[in-house]
Regions:
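Structural preference for beta-rich elements and adjacent junctions enriched in aromatics
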Residues: 1-214
Length: 214
């Protein structure tokens, strides 16, 4: 099973705001989202993430370079997976249910909870509005032809409404991270932990990897 370790982000840095959080995550190990089992042709984006935590919540930063970019959806729980989208799914303890968090390049969120793809409950808009985001998007580079965008996220523990969490130190969680873009000119479906499935599908908790919170 693929796994990595998440370090503690000092509270005083977190309290300085999203730019300080983003800078801290730049110093953490970068995990690559580069498994593309359903890719036959075209260009693949370059995607990485860094993850940290503390007694306030979970901190996550994505970095993306891709040929095409869409960021059309602006309302919480819109179908952002049709845009340029990054995602992470997480299950706590032995729970067979998991949360799915999906964001387009401007930070619009689609999030749910359930046991499988067809058993999702949208998280309340008021709850999702408490997720802090910092998005930076650079126009298409004249030399490489690629868009560069980054998304930094802070998930307070209160977002995980079906669990009572105050600290994840010395705990492990099942997890996977993804990049997709269903309606891009060249659709793609990438994951951090490998997936074995005949067609693109992210809702496969049995194939999640593992994060160890130090």
């Amino acid at each position: 099973m693929k796994q990595f370790k998440s370090h503690c982000l000092p509270v005083h840095i977190a309290n300085e705001g999203m730019e300080s959080i983003s800078a801290f995550l730049d110093g953490e190990e970068r995990q690559q989202i580069d498994n593309a089992p359903w890719h036959d042709f075209g260009n693949l984006p370059q995607v990485s993430f860094s993850l940290a935590h503390n007694q306030q919540g979970i901190y996550l930063k994505y970095r993306v370079m891709e040929k095409h970019m869409l960021a059309r959806y602006k309302n919480i729980n819109d179908p952002v997976y049709k845009d340029s989208c990054v995602e992470f799914f997480i299950a706590f303890g032995d729970d067979e249910h998991y949360y799915n968090f999906e964001f387009n390049a401007i930070g619009t969120a689609l999030c749910g909870y359930g046991e499988g793809k067809n058993d999702r409950k949208d998280l309340p808009v008021a709850i999702l509005a408490t997720i802090n985001t910092l998005s930076t998007v650079e126009h298409q580079d004249a030399e490489t032809g690629l868009y560069n965008w980054e998304l930094t996220l802070f998930f307070p523990f209160s977002v995980f409404i079906y669990h009572s969490i105050s600290d994840l130190t010395e705990q492990q969680c099942s997890i996977n991270f993804y990049k997709c873009g269903d309606e891009l000119p060249e659709p793609h479906f990438l994951s951090w932990a490998p997936i074995k499935h005949p067609y693109p599908e992210f809702h496969l908790p049995a194939q999640f990897g593992l994060v160890v919170f130090e």
